[in-house]
C-alpha cells in the first residue's frame, strides 16, 4: 500500500494456531510428496473459471486479502469470503506462497491450505487470482536475509517449476489468471529491485505456466506506486516498467498489475502533479505511454491493490485538509475513497480490474506504528467501518449501470 511517497513493508510473521492478520510463512511438510497431477488432499474442489473472456462485464471487481485467508480458521475463512460476496465482488486476490508450499525442499508439496481457500471461494462463485511469489529459504539468493520471503530466487527456473506445478494443479479447477510476484519495484524483491532479474523470472515463469495451461492469463507483478528513492530501495512504477519493457518483459504478459493508492486524495482527483491513478494514463509520465512506446499499446491494467489506511503513526486526513506528517485517513474519508474507487477505475478505459485491499484490520491502536495493519473494511474486532457499506453501494451502482 502506498500513500503517494510512503510505502508499507508487509512481512510475514510466525505461525500461530488461528490468525486474523497476515500469517505464518512456514508450515510442516506433508509426510509424502504431492505431485501436481495428484488428486487434491483436501475436499473436492469446484471449478470456477477465472480467465477473462469476451462478453463479461467491463470491470472485474475483487477484494485483495494478501496471505490472511490461508491462515484463518474455517470460520474466519468463511467470514472473510462471505464479505466479498456481500460486497458484490466477483474475485479474490490471494497470495500463493512458494515458501508455504515448499518450505523445506523442491520435492515436497504442502497444497492443502491453498486448496481450502480455492474450495471455499469457488463454493461462493468467487474467482481466485493467485499472487505467486515468496521465496523459501532454501531457494533464495545468497546475501539475502533467511527469514525474508521477499528475497529473489537464486534460480528462476526453480521458481518457474513451482509456478508450473501450481498451474497444473489449479487450471483444471478454473484458475487461469496469475499475478507473477508482488511489487518487484520495491524491496518486496529483496535485497533491492532489479528489473533485469525480474524480467528473467518473467521469461521462465510465463513459459512454464503457459506450457501447463494454454488458457493462462498472466499479470506482471503489481507495481507499487512510488517515486524512485535509492535510499529506500524504490524504483518508480514507470521507470521499472520501462526497464522491463526494454528487455521485452511486457510482451511476456497479458496485462500489468498496479497498486495505485492515492490517499490522501480521491482516486478521481485531478491534480497538477499526478496522483497514482493519474499515472495510469493521464499524467505526463504514465504507464500506458510506456506500454505504447515498447510495442504493447492498449495492454490492460489490473489494479490488484488499492484502498486507504485508517490508522498510523502520524496524522489523519479527512480529505478536506492534509495535516503535516499525514500517514492515514479518517474512517469517514476512507468511505469516500471506497465510494470513488469503482467509478474512477471504470472511467478509465485502460483499467480492466480493481481490487480493494483489504477485508479486515489486523491490528489495534497499540499497533498504529504499523500502518499496513489498518487498510481493512472491518476493524480488528470485526465491526464494519463506514467504507464497507460505501464500497458495497458503489459496486451495486456499477452493476446496475452494466445492466442498461
Where are these regions (language model features)?
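Structural recognition of alpha->loop->beta junctions
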Residues: 88, 164, 168-176, 240-255, ...
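Boundary/entry segment of secreted carbohydrate-active catalytic domains
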Residues: 35-90, 95-97
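Extracellular serine-dependent O-acyl
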Residues: 176-181, 218, 256, 299-306, ...
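Secretory targeting and sorting signals
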Residues: 5-31
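Aromatic-rich peripheral "rim/lid" segments of glycoside hydrolase catalytic domains that contact
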Residues: 2-6, 46-47, 139, 313, ...
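Noncatalytic carbohydrate-binding groove/subsite architecture in carbohydrate-active enzymes
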Residues: 54, 156, 160, 195-331
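Substrate-binding cleft and catalytic face of glycoside hydrolase catalytic domains
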Residues: 87-233, 251, 263, 297
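Short, acidic/polar
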Residues: 70-85, 159-167, 234-246, 335-344
Amino acid at each position: 500500500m502506498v500513500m503517494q511517497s510512503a510505502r508499507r513493508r508487509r512481512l510475514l510473521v510466525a505461525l500461530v494456531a488461528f490468525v486474523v492478520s497476515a500469517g505464518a510463512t512456514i508450515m510442516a511438510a506433508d509426510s509424502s510428496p504431492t505431485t501436481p497431477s495428484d488428486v487434491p488432499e483436501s475436499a473436492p474442489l469446484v471449478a470456477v473459471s477465472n480467465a477473462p473472456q469476451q462478453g463479461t462485464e467491463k470491470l472485474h471487481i475483487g477484494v485483495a486479502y494478501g496471505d490472511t485467508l490461508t491462515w484463518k480458521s474455517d470460520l474466519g475463512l468463511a467470514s472473510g469470503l462471505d464479505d466479498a460476496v456481500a460486497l458484490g465482488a466477483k474475485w479474490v486476490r490471494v497470495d500463493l506462497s512458494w515458501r508455504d508450499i515448499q518450505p523445506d525442499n523442491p520435492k515436497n508439496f504442502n497444497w492443502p491450505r491453498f486448496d481450502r481457500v480455492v474450495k471455499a471461494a469457488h463454493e461462493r462463485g468467487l474467482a481466485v487470482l493467485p499472487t505467486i511469489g515468496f521465496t523459501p529459504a532454501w531457494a533464495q539468493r545468497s546475501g539475502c536475509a533467511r527469514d525474508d520471503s521477499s528475497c529473489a530466487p537464486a534460480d528462476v527456473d526453480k521458481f518457474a517449476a513451482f509456478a508450473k506445478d501450481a498451474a497444473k494443479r489449479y487450471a483444471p479447477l478454473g484458475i487461469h489468471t496469475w499475478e507473477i510476484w508482488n511489487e518487484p519495484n520495491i524491496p518486496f524483491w529483496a535485497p533491492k529491485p532489479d528489473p533485469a532479474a525480474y524480467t528473467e523470472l518473467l521469461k521462465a515463469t510465463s513459459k512454464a505456466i503457459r506450457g501447463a495451461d494454454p488458457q493462462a492469463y498472466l499479470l506482471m507483478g503489481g507495481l507499487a506506486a512510488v517515486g524512485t528513492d535509492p535510499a529506500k530501495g524504490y524504483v518508480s512504477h514507470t521507470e521499472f516498467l520501462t526497464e522491463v519493457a526494454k528487455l521485452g518483459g511486457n510482451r511476456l504478459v497479458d496485462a500489468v498489475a498496479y497498486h495505485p493508492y492515492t490517499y490522501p486524495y480521491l482516486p478521481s482527483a485531478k491534480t497538477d502533479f499526478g496522483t497514482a491513478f493519474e499515472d495510469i494514463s493521464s499524467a505526463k509520465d504514465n504507464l500506458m505511454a510506456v506500454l505504447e512506446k515498447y510495442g504493447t499499446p492498449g495492454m490492460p491494467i489490473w489494479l490488484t491493490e488499492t484502498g486507504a489506511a485508517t490508522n498510523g503513526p502520524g496524522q489523519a486526513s479527512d480529505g478536506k485538509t492534509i495535516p503535516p506528517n499525514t500517514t492515514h485517513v479518517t474512517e469517514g474519508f476512507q468511505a469516500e475513497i471506497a465510494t470513488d474507487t469503482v467509478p474512477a477505475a471504470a472511467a478509465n478505459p485502460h483499467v480492466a480490474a480493481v481490487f480493494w485491499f483489504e477485508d479486515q484490520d489486523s491490528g489495534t491502536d497499540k499497533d498504529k506504528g504499523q500502518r499496513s495493519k489498518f487498510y481493512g473494511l472491518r476493524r480488528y474486532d470485526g465491526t464494519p467501518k463506514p467504507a464497507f457499506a460505501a464500497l458495497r453501494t458503489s459496486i451495486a451502482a456499477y452493476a446496475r449501470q452494466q445492466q442498461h
